[in-house]
Amino acid sequence: MSKMAQVNGDLPAVNSATAQHLLDIPVIHDGVVAFRNNPLGKKSIAIGDSAYQTFAAPLLPYLARPWGYLRPYAEKADALGDQTLTKVEERVPVIKKPTEELYAGAKGIIALPIRTGFEAKDHVFKTYAQEKKKVGGENLVTYGKAIVSTTLITTSEIIIWVGDVMHYKKEEAKDIVNEKVNN
């Protein structure tokens, strides 16, 4: 394995601006550190380094001359990659957030449908209990009335919510059209 200094998960500097830029992104950095600390990752790195030392390192002196011709193109490609990553960071600033923050956000987004489903279920059962209490009695007819009134109430709430969403989107579309027309 090549001698690369690693202290507390810090990664050694690399010769490529693009690769270094990628390693400066918290999610990628943490992924590389996790891979290096994983036993399978360590073994993969050891095998890869061994293959490099056995097969590629002896050929490097023979590739020095062709590399001299290719170096300006590789440096230009590296600079373009670095510039592209800078532009991506400007357009998508979320990639510079710490990994824990991204993980918590993703966890919240994934749990949203489940949480919303449970809240909706609780709301329907609460509405049913209120309607059953209003109707009074403990027989099949009162349960049926409570179910029908719960269905009507829930349906009207959904229709109101859809109307609010459509109104908001309509106003948003108007603003976009006005902005496009005025520019």
Swiss-Prot record:
Function: Lipid droplet coating protein that regulates lipid metabolism, appressorial turgor pressure, and virulence. Appressorial turgor pressure is important for the mechanical penetration of the host cuticle during infection.
Primary site of residence: other
Subcellular location as annotated: Lipid droplet
Top-level taxon in the UniProt lineage: Eukaryota
Similarity annotation: Belongs to the perilipin family.
Recorded phenotype for the gene knockout or disruption: Shows fewer lipid droplet numbers and leads to thinner spores and smaller appressoria. Results also in reduced turgor pressure generation and enlarged appressoria pore size. Drastically decreases virulence on avocado and tomato fruits, as well as on rubber tree leaves.
UniProtKB keywords: Lipid droplet, Virulence
Name by which UniProt lists this protein: Lipid droplet coating protein Cap20
